[in-house]
Regions:
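Long, distal/terminal scaffolding or interaction modules
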Residues: 599-601, 605-608, 616-629, 636, ...
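A beta-strand-loop signature enriched in Asp, Gly, Thr, and Trp
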Residues: 604-619, 623, 928-946
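Extracellular "leader-to-stem" segments immediately downstream of a signal peptide or signal-anchor
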Residues: 4-76, 82, 87-169, 173-176, ...
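Conserved metal-binding segment of the jelly-roll/cupin
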Residues: 72-79, 83-85, 93-95, 414-425, ...
Length: 1010
């Protein structure tokens, strides 16, 4: 929310010109009087800068939440000294109110803020997985013995605005705010005066707007956000940090109109990590060492891009940490029109290569700073409270006519918290501005089965704007009800300067309802899950059309009842999307049809297990001149169904993709009888392809890349380099196959898990079904007796059993875990592919101030011996008993997670032998020696591709499945590539001569003889 910054423009310009030691000018209070919110809690502290106001503020925070779990706290003008960490409950927003912006002050040398990292204000979270205990307490609380649950991927709406943070002298460990948030949370209109403190924000999330960081060791230090979505920083400044303005990794940092001054480093990506980093209109002034420090070169997760960056007295634009290579500026002042580093995909149908692209030109002087990306709201004195106009907002009275009358009479309307019932279209004036302060509890909603929205007919939205309008919609929730076929939340025809910000489309996660009922209260039982849950049965939630455009920032659209979350059609008016989350739809999340001149910075989609197995993330039709940067296409870990492509293009051209991230893994924090901890759940069903051009029948298999330009419609696309071996399809028609192994005769065994079938394929007999009992088999191996050792997900700790594929169908041997024992002839089974990440647990060492790297985590975890193992009846195979993490019920309706269950299959070796595995969290293939208890030690990176699987042939060649199959010599040099019609999931050698490379994809089995 941006209010009244324009009055500061001249002062800011003068300050910037005053010299390199100038600081950001103090901004006025954006809420000079308290908004009329009868349910808000006002802090009753002293506010004199001397008294300890910790208790007063905490009491207000603790009492703010209403029965829906949301609320607001008003902090009046004053200086509030605190002596311990303040905890903000989930769903609570803090607004500074009064003629001057209030300050939360950490007094000089406050005990507890001298060592490690200690946070003044922590935004907390709820018990997302109903654990009871707190699996990973926040480690930066003062006092340290206080147990606090961190914000997490289920923490929405929390915010702080119009409050300054100040750190007094002698607090080198102090951080201002921990903001590890999910959607619809923000910090705005703030100034962090950090002195000798550690950082302004430690652990960031969602969006920060119009925030200014002065001093400190760092302005922001952060790992990835709690849901692993993007973090967007808009209209903000950094000045005078001692080490770097921003230190981060994996946070998908997206910057728009950010200025960094008087510091050694602008943005530092931590050692051993990458990031999807995108900066638009970023200024670097007096940045002595590097504008950006890039780590993890030649890794797919390192995606660095800038557009229209400006620099003055900043000689090095980019420095590469490992190689020491630099990309230098040109002269004292220069412009970086474009910069990109990472895996570059030359065109559709091709694989990527690592490259640096930089377009830098010298300037005689820097131009003036651009206008804010988020326009100001009007001053408060112009707001008209709708409650003074006869509008009730009690969730019962029909407010439609009264709201329309108010819109017609007043350009600026303020909606206090409440549920405003709407039964017909509300049409905005060309200059209408509608404002709320908390979308979860300030909703315009349509009641279920409203007569005007029933049956077959054209779209009838809650709000409709006029073509070319100069409108603003801010801080409101819009809910179209459960059953209203003609409904849409917002039909937007407004012009380029219009703004939609802090708006939530209700219907997904975090949806309080006016009737107090669950979203699924009108579920039916036809047998069709889409019909049963009323999915895909309304018009798009947000529909921009007929020349509409403007800026859309911090918008969340997860209403599963709608056909799409964000739909744009028939417009060439420029549009700007910043930090938008569109999720949980049955068919499409984003749809663009006949659209030009739009940019999407940090768009994120998510397909849930129940509503999204068939959903496409981006559907682009008949469109051109588009930019997608820091795009994240995620499918939840519990997904059971494969899906072909995240992005689909139809008759579209001139599209720039920058920093693309397509995945399906997520951290999980819980407690069980083995203790508390975290684990990285990995689905086997991310989108197979990042992009599919339906018109050209071409795909982009790379799921992680820095750059792809979809060129002109009539262009000729070069043919990729030839595959080094032909591929033959052996069988198809499967749901999703993996978990394979071969026997001593070379026959292939594999699992189609959805249908609980264990198959065998051989040249002599073709495809057979060996077993199909309902035992939930996941992975298997063949022992020396040609019996199958099968890992099952059935049971609270999963299970292992053995079967004779030639024996009676009603017999199996259940194998119990036993203490690890050394045996010379025993082969140890290990996952061929691993996922390993530090989500949900801070990785910062509070003494060295270094983060544990992904490689260090991987080496630590795979190098830890397991105490028990599952041994095949003949004693020839041992599967380490990996810890199993349980989510949901203990029967087959719940989920189980472990390194063995996550894997696409197993590899094996004897003690001391070296094997190859992939770490998908780094996308690196390693070799390692098998140690006691299934430990993998003496790890050595082998190749900078490491996705789904790896296999080694009799010549020592190494085959890595990562979109296609990449072939390496034993020395690590790439020899070629085998192209497969579908994405390979598992590869292994078999056949009578052990020279057949079996290739398992979701739906088909292939073979090659390289």
């Amino acid at each position: 929310m941006m209010i009244r910054r324009n009055i500061m423009a001249a002062l800011l310009t003068a300050t910037a010109m005053a010299g390199v030691n100038a600081t950001h000018a103090a901004e006025p209070s954006v809420f000079p009087t308290a908004p009329q919110e009868p349910t808000a809690v006002t802090v009753a502290g002293k506010g004199d800068g001397r008294a300890d106001d910790s208790d007063a503020i905490q009491q207000a925070l603790d009492s703010a939440r209403d029965k829906t779990g949301h609320g607001m706290v008003f902090l009046p003008s004053g200086t509030y000294r605190i002596t311990r960490t303040l905890i903000v409950p989930p769903g609570v927003r803090i607004y500074g109110v009064g003629p001057t912006r209030p300050v939360i002050l950490l007094g000089a040398r406050t005990p507890g803020f001298q060592q490690g990292v200690s946070t003044m204000i922590v935004f907390g979270g709820g018990d997302q997985y109903r654990v009871g205990d707190v699996p990973v307490p926040v480690p930066t609380i003062v006092p340290r013995d206080k147990v606090v649950r961190d914000a997490n991927s289920g923490t929405f709406y929390s915010a702080m605005s119009n409050v300054d943070i100040e750190i007094g002298a002698g607090n080198p460990a102090a951080a201002g705010v921990r903001f590890h948030m999910a959607q619809h949370a923000f910090l705005s209109h703030m100034e962090f005066r950090l002195g000798d403190g550690f950082a302004g924000v430690y652990q960031a999330g969602n969006i920060i707007e119009n925030v200014h960081f002065q001093g400190g060791r760092y302005g922001i230090v952060t790992e990835k956000t709690s849901p692993a979505w993007q973090f967007t920083l808009i209209d903000s400044t950094f000045d005078g940090q001692r080490d770097a303005a921003i230190r981060e990794h994996e946070v998908d940092l997206t910057m728009v109109n950010v200025a960094i001054r008087n510091t050694p480093v602008g943005i530092e990506v931590d050692r051993g990590y990458g990031d999807s980093l995108w900066g638009k209109d970023v200024r670097f002034e007096n940045v002595s060492q590097a504008g950006v420090v890039i780590s993890n070169e030649n890794n797919v997760f390192t995606q660095i891009g800038f557009e229209n960056a400006l620099a003055k007295n900043s000689p090095v634009f980019a420095r590469f940490r490992q190689s020491g290579r630099t990309v230098d500026g040109k002269g004292d002042a220069y412009k970086v029109a474009s910069f990109s580093y990472g895996l570059m995909v030359p065109d559709l149908g091709h694989v990527g290569e690592y490259r640096t692209d930089a377009d830098i030109e010298a300037l005689p002087a820097l131009p003036a700073r651009r206008a804010p990306a988020i326009r100001d709201l009007p001053p408060m004195q112009d707001w008209v409270n709708v409650r003074t106009l006869g509008i009730v907002g009690d969730g019962k009275a029909d407010d439609t006519a009264a709201i329309q009358k108010a819109i017609n009479a007043h350009p600026i309307l303020y909606f206090p918290t409440g549920f405003y019932k709407v039964t017909d279209r509300l049409t905005l004036r060309p200059d209408s501005i509608l404002i709320g302060l908390h979308p979860a509890i300030t909703q315009l909603y349509i009641p279920d089965e409203n007569p005007r929205h029933a049956g077959l007919g054209s779209v009838l939205p809650i709000l409709e704007s006029r073509k070319g309008g100069d409108n603003i919609l801010s801080g409101l929730g819009l809910f179209t009800g459960r059953v209203n076929p003609r409904a849409s939340a917002l039909l937007w025809r407004s012009g380029e300067k219009s703004l939609v910000e802090d708006v939530k489309i209700m219907g997904g996660g975090g949806t309080p309802t006016a009737d107090g009922k669950m979203l699924g209260s009108l579920t039916v039982h036809t047998g069709d899950p889409v019909t049963d849950h009323r999915l895909d049965a309304q018009y798009p939630s947000i529909w921009v059309t007929d020349g509409g455009g403007g800026t859309f920032a911090d918008v969340w659209s997860p209403n599963s009842f709608a056909q799409a979350g964000f739909y744009i059609s028939d417009t060439s008016t420029p549009g700007h999307v910043y930090e938008m989350s569109v999720e949980h739809h049955a068919r499409n999340e984003f749809v663009l049809d006949n659209v030009q001149n739009w940019e999407f910075l940090a768009p994120q989609t998510e397909q849930e297990v129940g509503d999204g197995p068939d959903a496409v993330s981006l559907d682009i039709r008949n469109s051109k001149n588009l930019l997608f940067a820091n795009y994240h296409g995620y499918r939840v870990t519990r997904t059971y169904a494969p899906e072909k492509s995240a992005v689909k293009l139809y008759n579209s051209s001139d599209i720039r993709f920058r920093n693309v991230h397509v995945n399906a893994e997520s951290g999980y924090a819980t407690c069980d009888d083995e203790g508390c901890g975290t684990f990285l759940r990995a689905s086997k069903y991310p989108f197979d392809n990042a992009i599919e051009d339906v018109s050209r029948k071409l795909f982009v298999r790379e799921r992680e890349f820095a750059k792809l330009d979809i060129g002109a419609a009539g262009r000729t696309i070069p043919t990729p380099t030839a595959s080094m071996a032909p591929v033959e399809k052996l069988e198809d028609g499967f749901w999703s196959i993996s978990g394979a192994s071969v026997d001593t005769k070379g026959a292939l065994y594999f699992i189609d898990r959805r249908f609980q079938r264990i198959h065998r394929w051989s040249e002599a007999k073709g495809l057979e079904i060996v077993r199909d009992q309902a035992l939930d088999p996941v992975n298997l191996a063949v022992d020396a007796s040609d019996h199958l050792l099968v890992l099952s997900s059935l049971g609270p700790k999963a299970g292992v059993y053995s079967i004779d594929p030639e024996g009676p169908l009603d017999q199996l041997t259940l194998i119990q875990p036993t203490p690890v024992r050394a045996a010379a002839r025993k082969r140890t089974l290990l996952p061929v592919n691993w996922w390993n990440n530090g989500e949900f647990r801070d990785q910062l060492d509070h003494k060295s101030y270094e983060f544990t790297t992904l490689a260090e985590m991987f080496a630590r975890d795979v190098g830890t011996p397991k105490a028990q193992e599952y041994v095949s009846p003949d004693g020839s195979l041992a599967l380490p008993a990996f810890r199993v993490w349980q989510q949901g019920p203990i029967d087959h309706t719940g989920w189980r997670w472990s390194d063995g269950l996550n894997a696409n299959g197993f590899v094996s070796g004897k003690m001391g032998e070296r094997i190859f595995v992939t770490n998908a969290s780094e996308n690196v293939t390693y070799s390692g020696a098998i140690g006691k208890g299934g430990a993998l030690v003496d790890l050595k990176p082998f190749a900078n591709r490491g996705g789904e699987s790896v296999a080694v042939d009799g010549q020592g060649r190494v085959f890595v499945a990562n979109g296609q199959i990449f072939v390496y010599g034993s020395d690590g040099a790439q020899m070629g590539r085998i192209d497969v019609p579908d994405r390979p999931l598992q590869i292994l050698f078999g056949g009578p001569d052990k020279r057949t490379l079996f290739i398992l994809t979701h739906h088909a089995l292939y073979a090659a003889k390289p």
